[in-house]
Amino acid sequence: MQTKIPVLSALALSFGLLSAHAFAANPETVTIGYQKANIFALLKYRGTLDETFKKEGINIRWVEFPAGPQMLEGLNVGSIDLAATGDAPPAFAQAAKADLIYLGHSPANPKTEAIVVPKDSPIKSVADLKGKRVGLNKGSDVNYLLVKALEDAGLNYKDVKPVYLPPADARAAFQKGAIDAWVIWDPFLAEVEANADAREIRNAEGLVPHYTFYLASRPFAEGHPDTAKQVVDELSKLSDWANANQDEAAAILSKSTGLDKSIWQTTLKRLPYGATRMTPQVFDEQQALADTFTRVGLLPVKVDVRSATWSLDKK
């Protein structure tokens, strides 16, 4: 009789773990944050994830945000479960003690962000930016590009006059000549090149990788790992479709953002979509970003990027 008790206990424990896992794999609702121009917007408008989850009894609630930092604040306070942002916002969120997890990343896309100047500007290179007014979104991916581009040109961040503006305000300032240069990402980059004859003096190639990260709140990623993995898988399938059907993807994103389809066609030609799980190399590159922001004083503390590793990726 004594020998049966441990066996029964083990069976009960196994059943409990399996039951908990099954429950965790099927949340009633998944709340996803998105921006009009990012891959989750494409996923929303395509409807493929909604269809997949509906078959499993899972509802999706889509919540729009104006930018990555606000989205990650929503992730931190529990108003959303999943988000996709560029590489800088998660580092700033981690510095603010946000309890997030890196689920995966896109391919590097350095051609989708650049430093531009007016067509007739005397500025010919990054070195010419010394003492100039440079518009950018503070704490964004392009903030990292500017720091690294200046250092590559033998300058430092204090050698320019940063003018911190969101894209819409920076676009107006660029048009009026209130800033000498603008550091910006697609599709805004493609738009200003097409409609304002902006001239590129440096993109991110050879300087910074520029990833999109797929992020989750820690409670969601650890509590519903199968669902989180399924989202990454769906993003990978969507990426394959978008890369092979750029005209259709451009039409969807044009509708989402209000930008001309031609702007999105230009953007998608230099934007490789994709979704893969995190690797040591990508964590190293993200750590380099965080360390750079700390070094130049944009982050108040040192960030341990790997503290946001998903338990499924720990070895």
Identify the residue ranges that each predicted region occupies.
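Bacterial N-terminal signal peptides that target proteins for export
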Residues: 1-9
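Bacterial N-terminal signal peptides
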Residues: 9-19
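Short, glycine-/small- and polar/acidic-enriched structural segments
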Residues: 25-153, 162-164, 180-184, 206-208
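Small-molecule pocket liners
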Residues: 39-40, 109-115, 198-199, 210-214, ...
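Pocket-lining segment of extracytoplasmic ligand-binding domains
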Residues: 88, 162-255
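Short helix-loop capping/hinge motifs at secondary-structure junctions, enriched
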Residues: 119-128, 155-157, 219-228
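Secondary-structure end/capping motifs
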Residues: 222-298
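Conserved C-terminal helix/tail region of periplasmic/extracytoplasmic solute-binding proteins
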Residues: 291-315
